[in-house]
């Protein structure tokens, strides 16, 4: 067998192997393209119906909350982010840093903000007990996550 024949045979084997590898790799890349990533900051729970009587007391309003969770290892600044209900009532986050793998509850009533609890300082309920939608948007007004419950929604987390 001549040297040029051996070189051609090696080249043909390399081309064939490359074609097989690219054929195998293509479906994996194509499948990855359609995959939707989970939000890095998400609405992890909603308690729209405060326990007990709805007497519009501050205690009752603060038992109505939306829990926001940072699923990453890195802190996220929520400054300028918004949490909104279906009627358009909006809470705007101030300079709030949410540590990695931590959560904060956004309560409806009046209170003093802490790392674990934020307060909208409202005098009336925000979330409809029977059907509503909580929408979390980032500081570029892009929807990051949303949860619906009741008519037209499937989420009910009490």
Regions found by a protein language model. Give the residues of each.
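Local beta-strand/beta-hairpin segments that build beta-sheet-rich folds
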Residues: 90, 143-145
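Hydrophobic beta-strand signal
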Residues: 67, 84, 105-107
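Intrinsically disordered, low-complexity Pro/Gly/Ser/Thr-rich segments with frequent PxxP/GP/PP motifs
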Residues: 88-121
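Short, surface-exposed ligand- or partner-binding patches at beta-edge/loop junctions that are enriched
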Residues: 118-138
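A structural motif detector for short, solvent-exposed N-terminal "entry" segments of globular domains
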Residues: 2-78, 125-129, 145-158
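Acidic glycine-/aspartate-rich tracts in secreted/extracellular proteins
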Residues: 72-74, 109-112, 139-143
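Short acidic, flexible loop segments centered on an aromatic residue
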Residues: 73-89
């Amino acid at each position: 067998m001549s040297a040029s024949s051996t070189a051609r045979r090696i080249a043909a084997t390399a081309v064939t192997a490359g074609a097989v590898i690219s054929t195998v790799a293509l479906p994996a890349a194509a499948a990855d393209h359609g995959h939707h990533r989970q939000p890095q900051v998400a609405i992890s729970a909603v308690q729209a119906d405060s326990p007990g009587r709805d007497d519009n007391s501050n205690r009752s309003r603060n038992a109505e909350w939306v829990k926001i969770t940072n699923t990453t290892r890195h802190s996220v600044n929520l400054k300028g982010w918004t949490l909104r209900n279906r009627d358009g009532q909006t809470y705007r986050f101030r300079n709030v840093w949410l540590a990695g793998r931590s959560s904060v509850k956004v309560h409806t009533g009046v209170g003093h903000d802490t790392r674990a609890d934020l307060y909208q300082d409202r005098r009336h309920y925000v979330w409809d007990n029977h059907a509503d939608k909580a929408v979390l948007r980032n500081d570029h007004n892009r929807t990051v996550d949303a949860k619906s419950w009741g008519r037209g929604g499937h989420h009910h987390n009490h």
